[in-house]
Amino acid sequence: MMKSKMKLMPLLASLSLISGCTVLPGSNMSTMGKDVIKQQDADFDLDRMVNVYPLTPRLVEQLRPRPNVAQPNMSLDQEIASYQYRVGPGDVLNVTVWDHPELTTPAGQYRSSSDTGNWAQPDGTMFYPYIGKVSVVGKTLSEIRSDITGRLAKYIADPQVDVNIAAFRSQKAYISGQVNKSGQQAITNVPLTVLDAINAAGGLTDMADWRNVVLTHNGKEQRISLQALMQNGDLSQNRLLYPGDILYVPRNDDLKVFVMGEVKKQSTLKMDFSSMTLTEALGNAEGIDLTTSNASGIFVIRPLKGEGGRGGKIANIYQLDMSDATSLVMATEFRLQPYDVVYVTTAPVARWNRLINQLLPTISGVRYMTDTASDIHSW
């Protein structure tokens, strides 16, 4: 009896080996016994939800982004030409009355003009000798000068009055995000534009998304391309900043593409300031795997995002046939967009080899079991 059991041991070992082969290749998650929430569109046909475009020179040319060109900004020029600073609460004013030093604000040897000037009070006024309170908030310097001159004329013959601002403290714009020195910037008598503010903030960091800068003005957001403004001289992207404006430079985390499939290094790649081409993406992934890839099946999957719903389409797919390496010319001209997926398909022979590699352990196990059974019978 013991001898028979010993003869069965190799057979049991073989069965264990075969059983192991059916379990090992990857984990599994079964939906049996779980609550599966059925969706109304569960029976969708994915093939009908995408458009496939084989890449041709003409199509690549059509998809090429329109280059930004230098152009003027006439409306901005008019805003700057007509710009006048209006005094706000907290500003410090200096009033000079020529030939009347007793009325002129003394700066003193160790005191700055901002320390000895006239403050614009929260009630919108400042005090001045002889004439008392002067309304200043919301007025330009010329309006304040005219008011003081007219009221001083009752006490001084032909007063010569000059008014300037010693400290701008009431109005600010805010620069935040991916700049080297974020913070508030004073609105002064010198017009402050978006380009001025970025330069005053020390420029952009390496993480900045300079194509999608957000300017919030009066509660409304505007998208500004600093790339077009700074690189191409498109002044239409420049804006005049007003009190309370917020200029935000976002991170470039969303500027990424995914390279998957039969490449040597599957990667998530960040796009730099100058964008990225299909050739660059494949190069950063160390190229396609020449032993397993199907060179005629290089796809760029581009989600339609907010454009979805046009005929129920969710993505456009662009196919590059790289069987002839000359087609890399088209790949070099094909510019990727954020969240594009570059997918390199597997060659049929590679799929067959992988299937064989999966089956070989099982085939070997069955053969071993058969040989073992024959050995048992021969005993």
Swiss-Prot record:
Bilayer-crossing regions: none
GO cellular component, one term: pore complex
Gene3D superfamilies: 1.20.5.70, Outer membrane lipoprotein wza domain like (3.10.560.10), wza like domain (3.30.1950.10)
Keyword list, A-Z: Cell outer membrane, Exopolysaccharide synthesis, Ion transport, Lipoprotein, Membrane, Palmitate, Polysaccharide transport, Porin, Signal, Sugar transport, Transmembrane, Transmembrane beta strand, Transport
Pathway(s) this gene product operates in, as recorded in its UniProt entry: Glycan metabolism; exopolysaccharide biosynthesis
Pfam families: Poly_export, SLBB_2, Wza_C
Signal peptide: 1-20
GO molecular function: polysaccharide transmembrane transporter activity; porin activity
Function: Probably involved in the export of the extracellular polysaccharide colanic acid from the cell to medium.
Cellular location(s): Cell outer membrane
Organism: Salmonella typhi
UniProt protein name: Putative polysaccharide export protein wza
Lipidation (S-diacylglycerol cysteine): 21
Entry similarity comment: Belongs to the BexD/CtrA/VexA family.
GO BP: monoatomic ion transport; polysaccharide biosynthetic process
Lipid attachment residues per UniProt (N-palmitoyl cysteine): 21
Membrane topology: Multi-pass membrane protein
Gene field: wza
Main location: membrane
Organism domain of life: Bacteria
